[in-house]
Amino acid sequence: MLLLLLLLKISTFVDSFQIGHLEFENSNETRILEICMKNAGSWRDHRLISLPSCHNFNGLENAANLNYQYSVDLLIGAACDEETQTVSRLALRWHKLYLSSAPLSTKEKESTTIALKPHSLAGTAEVILAMCKSMKWKEIGIIYSEETKYTAHAIYDMLAEQEDDLKINVFLETDGLSNTYTILHSARALISFLTTLDLSKFFKTLKENAFRPLEFSIVHVDCNKSEISNFYTYLDNNAGEEPNPISAARLRKLYRHVALLKNSHDDMEKTEEFAKKYGLVPSYTLYKALILCDGLQLLNNYTAPRGNLSIVQQLPYLWNHVTNTETQGYSGPVFIGNDGVRLPYYEMHMWRDGKAVHVANVKPRESDYCGGNMTKNCYEFLPSSPLLEDLPPYTSDCGYDNNLCSDFHVFMIAAIVFSILLIPMAIAFYLQRKEHLIQQMPWRVPLDSISFDDNGGSLSASRRVSTISTARASYSSIFSGNVAEHAIVNKQKVSVKRHVQRRAITFSRQEMEMLNQLKYMSHTNINPFTGICFNQGSELIVMWQFTTRYSLEDLIFVKEQKFGRNFQSTFIKHIVHGINYIHNSSIKVHGALYLSNCVVDSYWVVKLTDFGIKGILKERTNHKELAPSSAFDVDAIHYKYLQLAPEHISAILEKLEEPRGTVEGDIYQLAMCIYQILFYMRPFAERQESIKELAHLLSSQSTAPLHPKVPEGNSFTMRLLSIIQQCWLYKPAARPALIKITDAVNREFGQDVKGTLIDQMIEMIDEYSANLEQIVAERTRELEQDMSVTENLLYQLLPKSVADSIRSGKTVVPEQHSSVTLLVVDVCQFTKFCEAFIPVHILETLQELYSSFDNIVQKNKAFKVENVGDAYLICSGIPEMSGFRHLREICKISLKLQAFMKTFKVRHRPSHTLQIKMGITSGAVAAGILGSTAPRFCIFGDTVNMACRMASTGNPGSIQLSELTANTLMEKFPSFMLEERGMIDVKGKGACLTFWLTGEKDIMRRQSSRSSCISQIKFELDEADNSKKMFLNV
């Protein structure tokens, strides 16, 4: 009936067709529509009347104005939802055609309205239905995020109303982690309305929890209008965050089964082309304006052939021509359903080889039943790539819970195979587990887990005795010159030794197996092996557990402690037990059984260390993976080598390398250790021959066997002494077995064990404390010596009065000194000097220069306050000095420095001349100590600034004095010769009169003996070098 009324209301043709435009606020729609009307021939000469809308419902008022005041023939615009539905109802009442750019469904608009926005939930549901039919999916699941809840529910309701064979097994909200069990056990084909973040989480859950994750197909419906490449790039980057490459590869394999379903109209390419063509800025507002242009273009295609715009009001004829037909618009293809709702176009993409591949188009088809409501067969799914065939089917042969497949026959076959292969499988499992343990390398220590002891450093520097470096170390090496250090590994203190690594180290399987065995060795008398750090820098670091009392060599020969029979028996038994455990293990031999490798913990338990590792290091050195240790010098052979078995000493002298240890060699060295514990003597200490001569005597087969001398009058039984001497036989096979040594030790000390374990511990502690008085006295003497060195160093850094106050514990209060003299020495062109030399040479040159300055200052009544870079500050008159003697002292020092610089040569470049500028000023300063942990003596005042100005404004090789200082010098000490320089501009002071100090009359009379002075200066330089070396050694 409405269409009949519209047919009756055909107005008389007028020359100007009026279009009423409800313009969105600040959208510039009018200009864009005028451009579109000019491009359309039938609209070019007609009037466009634009009134604002979408602001406090002014669009409703202006719609009425357009109808009643302007009598427009066509209404367009009103993009806001709150106005467009009401305008649609008004247009129906006025019998006007209304082109709306708002997203309206069939239920939300009237029959005279055409909804032009290509975003329709019903259309999206139609697209999903068409896709499922094309891919023969009969069961699906729908998952969505909280942000897409409205969209997902609307589409689900539309799909659920269809009388179709498409079944929705699951419809759940998830963040990628929750509700996943139900989802994974309900469907294999999933339609995703998740956010990109939730989708990435869901993929990780799918990878970890799904029984067969590669059976899942996921079609992700883009609700965020994101770029296609950005979507897949985000997923790929998310896979890159996996903890290992295998997990990342599994996740990327799952991404091959995800397809992105995207509205084609979300692509802004056509909008950008239009903006570029007409000089506009691409924006979403421009896109909405182009949607209105699509409506005008649609009507133009209908009216242009007829040449009469009034036929726009003939809606039945208009509807038949503009619906169910595809035309090209400004924003893309336009397809209006039979109810006046524009249907969207979709495209599908998949990810292959790092790029998005277009696999299908989904477009509307001509049908009398297609529109804004959910119908059937309104879309056709057009595949464009065979990649769609890679998506798995919608169901699994075994069902969603794997309940359709019977595993009975599988279990039967597995039981039979397991029964047949039980023993080989067990063996293979054992070997595999063993191999896995070897490849796991539990003995490897990461470099970042090692924290070196700041107070430890090189242990050789912590004692005065030269042998302490090996005695205090938890282990030693025969040929390595390295010194053990302390470090912290996993909150445990360890002893470490570094070896220079030349290139990447690759341990053989046999070596890794031995290191594993070392790592897992556990015995009371075996020091635990912490591990090795390698291929993480330029060093290989070997670590053993640290013991608090260091080694037996340290206790017996360095600390010179005397132990009774209880301690002796305990030490010997512990060593015997430890070596017995090593000989019965897969390591077999120790190879370096010295007292320095018998370390003692806080409970007086002896532990053997430094075994099983030297052969591996030697092999790595032969492969040039480690730098070789310092060459073995036969002429400077160490005393401890005399404790090796004769056959091993011969190998050392011949090959100059350490031989592999043997069980018989360990027996020989065990006897040497027992000898030293019993008699507190080093082997062959009574001999007069040199160590080299003793080594040749021991290795010689022609001479009589050479054994350590057993002291006479000892209290030990002949049984024990005899077994010790049998261990020293030259023939390895003739040496006694370890069990005989154990028996002799037990017989010797078995009667000494009396009382309970606590009684024995108390007795041992009493014996240990008996020698403490002598140790305390010795340590007191060492402390006094160290304090004397500290005092001398303190007097060099601070004035004597200040140093005495600090030593006595008094607080040093800042003081004001009314009359002192300062000398500032400035190295000329220091920047160019630094550019011409490498940093090491700069430091060496300045060290040599300033040491010479220090030597000159110390011979006068002055002291160096500080030197920073190229500045050197000297002060005289603190704390007190009668009269102006401090001025005379400073002048003498400056003249000596001037004379010294004439002969100073830069050692690394003798042709380079180094010059200094000096400035002298007398006056008042404030002096005091700054800092507590690292105190420094500092002076402040205008006198310091003036002295610096005198130095900076002077000439190279000259000594400049301020006017007041020069007048005082001429008055008090006329022997000094001054020359007036004149007025100069001094920063912060203005124009000042200054003088040059040119010499002293007494010194000038002695210039004839120039050569003798030069010799004296060279002597002083040598003394300065010696002082510097002594200072560094201290």
From Swiss-Prot:
It catalyses: GTP = 3',5'-cyclic GMP + diphosphate. Residues 17-409 are extracellular. Expressed in AQR, PQR and URX sensory neurons. The chain crosses the membrane at residues 410-430. GO terms for biological process: cGMP biosynthetic process; intracellular signal transduction; receptor guanylyl cyclase signaling pathway. Guanylate cyclase involved in the production of the second messenger cGMP. This is Receptor-type guanylate cyclase gcy-25.
